[in-house]
Regions:
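Conserved catalytic core of the tyrosine transesterase superfamily
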Residues: 1-335
């Protein structure tokens, strides 16, 4: 319980972020929380008669009217998805403050919340593109200064055959690979602190074993202790976000498939390909939700709907259907 009714917004933001950190979100997520909170708070401060720094702006200044005005200014140059995310962050912030006894109520229901469509899947384009990518990366490329195809193939396999996010790949440890032969799995520290287990088949298991063997040869047995990061760079250091993104980009270039990777979904295209193929092979939305670690069934359902749409488009493009449409002159079914 807080005793001072006019505690500063800046201090309370720090308290909220500290509380959120106990849920083990990714550094990227925590940075997004901070950015959403401080950006809106700065807009509120600018509208004060005498603008105040955030460590002097009282929380009581954040009335529903003030928050509506700040969000209207924030929304003007931004996409609906960005505004939606910021609204959710501020709603969580005020929910925390109510629980802590800092404020009597949450003003966010009075602030318009934009409705955003669920993002559509962006898998690799082309029926055989995933197989072409894996085959190209598995080959030793003489153009590379220090090729490590075993490591590169391990990264692609975990994304394409287990559907892991970038942050989940970076969080893996050697001990994350577990299970008896025939029941192998990868234990994933999922988004939002939701752990999950993803089964891996013999092909992926073999790829990962080959990678760890190659790592022992490069850096010694101590480099693959159970608590060691699973994915490392060519110096044996833990892979970082930029390094992993660059690795995947270089794999696309080596395979010559850059034009088949959707814009804005470079590594995520591999995860989307995993989910899309699950849907094509008949997996339910609930199964996709569990395997991908989605927070809601709606996210998983988009893969089912897209696949159904693609199936209808394929049927529509069938030459026999087109010929029949010409034959009947496009008449509807009157029966």
């Amino acid at each position: 319980m807080h005793d001072k009714p006019d505690e500063s917004v800046g201090r309370l933001i720090e308290e909220f972020l500290t509380a959120r950190a106990t849920r083990k979100p990714s550094p990227h997520t925590l940075a997004a929380y901070r950015r959403d909170l401080t950006t809106i708070a700065a807009l509120v401060s600018e509208d004060e008669t005498t603008p105040l720094p955030l460590d002097q702006l009282p929380i009581t200044a954040l009335s529903p009217r003030v928050m509506r005005t700040a969000f209207a200014r924030f929304a003007a140059p931004r996409a609906a998805a960005s505004v939606h995310r910021a609204w959710s962050t501020w709603n969580s912030f005020f929910t925390f403050l109510v629980a802590e006894g800092v404020v009597p109520g949450n003003p966010m229901p009075a602030v318009g919340r934009p409705r955003t469509p669920l993002p559509q899947p962006k898998p690799l384009r082309g029926e055989d593109t995933p197989e072409e990518l894996l085959a190209a990366v598995a080959r030793d490329d003489g153009r590379q200064r220090d090729p490590w195809p075993e490591r590169d193939l391990a990264v692609l396999s975990l994304a394409l055959c287990a559907g892991l996010r970038l942050s989940e790949l970076l969080a893996l440890r050697v001990a994350s690979l577990a299970g008896r032969p025939g029941e192998r799995r990868v234990d994933v520290a999922g988004k939002g602190g939701r752990p999950r287990t993803v089964p891996i088949e013999s092909g992926v298991d073999r790829v990962l074993a080959d990678y760890l063997d190659s790592r022992r040869r490069r850096f010694g047995a101590r480099s693959v202790r159970p608590d060691s990061p699973l994915l490392v760079d060519r110096r044996g250091e833990p892979l970082r976000r930029g390094g992993l993104q660059y690795l995947v980009e270089s794999c696309y270039r080596r395979a010559g498939i850059g034009d088949r990777v959707p814009r804005g979904a470079r590594l995520h295209a591999l995860r989307h390909t995993f989910a899309t193929r699950l849907a094509e092979d008949g997996a339910s939305a609930a199964e996709i939700m569990r395997l991908l670690g989605h927070a809601s069934l709606a996210s998983s359902q988009t893969y089912i709907e897209v696949t159904a749409g693609q199936q209808r488009a394929a049927v529509r493009s069938n030459r026999t259907n087109r010929a029949l449409a010409v034959l009947v002159g496009g008449r509807g079914d009157d029966s």
